[in-house]
Curated annotation (Swiss-Prot):
Keywords: Cleavage on pair of basic residues, Disulfide bond, Secreted, Signal, Toxin. Contains 2 disulfide bonds that can be either 'C1-C3, C2-C4' or 'C1-C4, C2-C3', since these disulfide connectivities have been observed for conotoxins with cysteine framework V (for examples, see AC P0DQQ7 and AC P81755). GO terms for molecular function: toxin activity. One of its GO terms (cellular component) is extracellular region. The lineage of its organism: Eukaryota, Metazoa, Spiralia, Lophotrochozoa, Mollusca. It is found in: Secreted. It comes from the Eukaryota. Expressed by the venom duct. Residues 1-22 form the signal peptide. Belongs to the conotoxin T superfamily. It holds the Pfam family Chi-conotoxin. The cysteine framework is V (CC-CC). This is Conotoxin Bt5.1.
């Protein structure tokens, strides 16, 4: 009788295990549009830093 509650708890834990779809995404799973957006954002940041005024640091922020 002692083992019954432990068995029930283990059974519930196994049943509530995350499914295959709940796995975190890998780099191979990321859509290509997301990578393109990241590249565009990085280029925009680099352009903004390049156009920065050397004599006025506040324009670089």
């Amino acid at each position: 009788m002692r083992g019954l509650p432990v068995f029930v708890i283990l059974l519930l834990l196994i049943a509530s295990e995350p499914s295959v779809d709940a796995r975190p995404k890998t780099k191979a799973d990321v859509p290509l549009t997301s990578l393109n957006d990241n590249a565009k954002r990085t280029l925009q940041i680099l352009r903004n830093k390049r156009a920065c005024c050397p004599y006025e640091p506040s324009c670089c922020i």
